[in-house]
Design a protein with these regions (language model features):
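Noncatalytic carbohydrate-binding groove/subsite architecture in carbohydrate-active enzymes
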Residues: 65-192
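Aromatic-lined carbohydrate-binding surfaces of glycoside hydrolases
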Residues: 1, 5-23, 96
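Structural recognition of alpha->loop->beta junctions
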Residues: 45-49, 107-114, 195-204
Length: 233
């Protein structure tokens, strides 16, 4: 399934609704006709849309307060749903975070039933030979000590069972100077098992390995490409 993130800081509500109409509208809509004129007769039927990305963190532009984002998320989400009522919207935020759960996620549950969670674990560099074993186990253990722990904390803070978790960014942290290893593959396999185990009890409805190309599953060189250990999982 495609999953598109809008930018409520740079784009207007109308522009975001127009993107929805371009993707999902038929010949009776203005932007659906534009898509058809460009050679794509059938709608893309993009169901999943995120109301921005990582709001609440210092590196993101826009209103990074829980109440401010909640207000903006409602105005944008409402406009997008007018263009395509069957969308499943996902709200953003620095989760787990009790304030954001109360002032943003719960306030948006009627239009955005999914809430985004991101987590990356630090990959050891395997610089010291005597530390290899400890570094290896520490990275694998992060599935439970970091990622599963975040899921449980977020589930508790969200409270409302109508709110579902979208674990839409997870990976071993990428560094161009560190080659992928079997460690990445075992972490990925362990993470997939954790997501399956927690899907029901913790309400995880969606998960996305990010980023797929050159930071995770697929490595692209100038003359060839191949699956990394993560990609082979």
């Amino acid at each position: 399934e495609p999953f598109i993130t809008i930018n409520p800081t740079w784009n207007t509500e109308e522009e975001c609704a127009q993107w929805v109409e371009y993707c999902n509208g038929d010949a009776n809509t203005e932007y659906g006709r534009i898509r058809i004129e460009r050679g794509y007769k059938d709608p893309y039927n993009v169901k999943y849309w995120s109301l921005g990305n990582e709001f609440g963190y210092g590196h993101m532009e826009g209103d990074n307060t829980a109440a401010g984002y909640g207000k903006k998320g409602r105005s944008y989400g409402t406009k997008m749903l007018e263009a395509s009522p069957d969308l499943i919207l996902c709200s953003s935020g620095p989760y787990p975070n009790k304030e954001w759960a109360e002032q943003s996620a719960r306030q948006l549950v009627d239009i955005a039933p999914m809430v985004s969670l991101h987590s990356y674990v630090a990959q050891p560099f395997f610089m010291e030979k005597e530390q290899y074993k400890e570094d290896y186990y520490e990275c694998i253990d992060k599935v439970d000590t970091q990622c599963r722990k975040l899921v449980h904390q977020m589930r508790e803070e969200l409270g409302d069972d109508r709110l579902r978790i979208s674990f839409d960014e997870w990976n071993v942290w990428y560094a161009w100077y560190r080659a992928k290893s079997v460690n990445d593959g075992i972490f990925t396999a362990s993470m997939l098992h954790m997501l399956i185990e927690e899907a029901g009890p913790s309400g995880i409805d969606m998960a996305c390995h990010f980023e797929a190309v050159n930071e995770g599953a697929i490595r692209v060189e100038w003359d060839h490409s191949f699956l990394t250990p993560s990609g082979k999982m």
